[in-house]
Amino acid sequence: MQKNAAHTYAISSLLVLSLTGCAWIPSTPLVQGATSAQPVPGPTPVANGSIFQSAQPINYGYQPLFEDRRPRNIGDTLTIVLQENVSASKSSSANASRDGKTNFGFDTVPRYLQGLFGNARADVEASGGNTFNGKGGANASNTFSGTLTVTVDQVLVNGNLHVVGEKQIAINQGTEFIRFSGVVNPRTISGSNTVPSTQVADARIEYVGNGYINEAQNMGWLQRFFLNLSPM
């Protein structure tokens, strides 16, 4: 019975470790929620007999005469020009050294130590040293360029626009997703209804994909199993 219990315990342990190695680590998307917004219907206009209708909804379908048409309401669109170029480097080093030395002796050896040292003079010397050197460095560089048209999904109290958008590109058996969200100041929108991504606050840019190309970049279950077991 004890042998069977030990055998069962060993098999159960290996099974748990195997499931741990097969565990998939999900990635949290940067842009969460809906990636589009629908215009909110305005109030029904009431005709007052004048050429200019003061109650006319200027939010949708309104073209100003003396200014460019710019997004200002939920459902309006604008184009984000992606111009991200980020590079960073870091290096560090540390050195530590410590040396110690101790000498002592005695002319008369205690009786309980005569078997070890004899009756002669005894000298004891101890020395030690410890040295540590450490260096580390890291470099990162990322470049992202392109365009993406987004939709205004929220108008903030101060007039800024919260935008969100997504572009999906299917190539053969894989699909690429480009998602974007952020806060745009209407003053930074150009006459061509574009704004660079470097002028968007709280920008979230995500470029992911699925398919066999993306799966080839993931570590296999057997590799994850041995990686979890390895002490290195």
Swiss-Prot record:
Q: Which UniProt keywords apply?
A: Bacterial flagellum, Cell outer membrane, Lipoprotein, Membrane, Palmitate, Signal
Listed Pfam families:
FlgH
GO terms for molecular function, please? cytoskeletal motor activity
Q: What Gene Ontology terms for biological process does this UniProt record contain?
A: bacterial-type flagellum-dependent cell motility; response to osmotic stress
The domain of life is: Bacteria
Look up and give the membrane topology term.
Lipid-anchor
* Alphabetical list of InterPro entries matching this protein: Flag_Lring
Q: Which GO terms describe its cellular component?
A: bacterial-type flagellum basal body, distal rod, L ring; cell outer membrane
Q: Where would one find coiled-coil regions in this protein?
A: none
Q: Where in the cell is it found?
A: Cell outer membrane; Bacterial flagellum basal body
Lipid attachment locations (N-palmitoyl cysteine):
22
Lipidation sites (S-diacylglycerol cysteine): 22
Q: Which residues form the signal peptide?
A: 1-21
- Subcellular location, principal: membrane
Q: Which PANTHER family match?
A: FLAGELLAR L-RING PROTEIN (PTHR34933:SF3)
- How does this protein assemble? The basal body constitutes a major portion of the flagellar organelle and consists of four rings (L,P,S, and M) mounted on a central rod.
The role this protein plays is:
Assembles around the rod to form the L-ring and probably protects the motor/basal body from shearing forces during rotation.
Task: Describe the family membership recorded for this protein in Swiss-Prot or TrEMBL.
Answer: Belongs to the FlgH family.
Q: Which NCBIfam families match?
A: PRK00249.1-1
Q: What is the protein name given in its UniProt record?
A: Flagellar L-ring protein
Q: Which organism is it from?
A: Escherichia coli (strain K12)
Q: Taxonomic classification, please?
A: Bacteria, Pseudomonadati, Pseudomonadota, Gammaproteobacteria, Enterobacterales
